[in-house]
Design a protein with these regions (language model features):
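Short functional hotspots at interaction and active-site rims
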Residues: 1-196
Length: 196
């Protein structure tokens, strides 16, 4: 059944991780003065971000996300668990107030038995798996690319500072539906139904 027939939002999900090590980017400096970004090297930890780019004809494109801070603890999972994804999807359903057609990759957490059970308990949710090795079909990858470029050469003081900066940058992207739509356009996917 097509999303339009159900009045559903089409949501593309993906996840990304960020560490305290700053990503390198190009910059300008006078000749002979190599710019140096001081990094303490102290502390550790990382953050994971799960995001949904949600589209529906006649509505502005939306970005919904969750940020999870990971501090190095023995035996602790360093990514999102099935219950974290379910909480994100429940929040998206409550926010969008409509059924969701979810399109995501074949990450082991997405195809696990526990995740299939969580999906089966949500009658408003229909899941479609992206083909293997096809990140170019997911507009959320464009969000991560844009976010990574905005974090270039940024030295953070700790994992909490990194989480705050990432949330701030994602908030900026949220207020730019034209940018979010451009990520969808870049994939080559369209919302127009194919003619019979």
């Amino acid at each position: 059944m097509m999303a339009a027939e159900r009045g559903a939002w089409i949501c593309f999900e993906d996840e990304a991780g960020h560490t305290l090590r700053p990503s390198k980017a190009r910059t300008w400096a006078p000749r002979g003065r190599t710019p140096v970004i001081p990094v303490s090297g102290k502390g550790s930890g990382r953050i994971s971000v799960a995001g949904l780019v949600c589209v529906k004809p006649g509505q502005r494109t939306r970005l919904l996300y969750r940020v999870k801070v990971h501090r190095p603890r023995k035996g602790e999972r360093r990514s999102f668990a099935e219950t974290d994804y379910a909480a994100l999807l429940d929040a998206a359903h409550q926010y969008l107030k409509a059924p969701i057609v979810l399109i995501w990759d074949n990450l082991n957490t997405h195809v696990s038995v526990a995740m299939r059970e969580l999906v089966a308990n949500r009658d408003w949710l229909h899941v479609i798996q992206l083909p293997v090795y096809a990140p170019d079909l997911n507009p959320t990858e464009g969000v991560w690319s844009h976010l990574k470029r905005s974090l270039g050469n940024l030295a953070v003081t700790g994992v909490d500072h990194l989480a705050a900066v990432v949330k701030n940058r994602l908030k900026r992207i949220q207020y730019r539906p034209d940018l979010l739509t451009s990520f969808l356009t870049h994939t080559g996917l369209t919302l127009d139904p194919e003619p019979p």
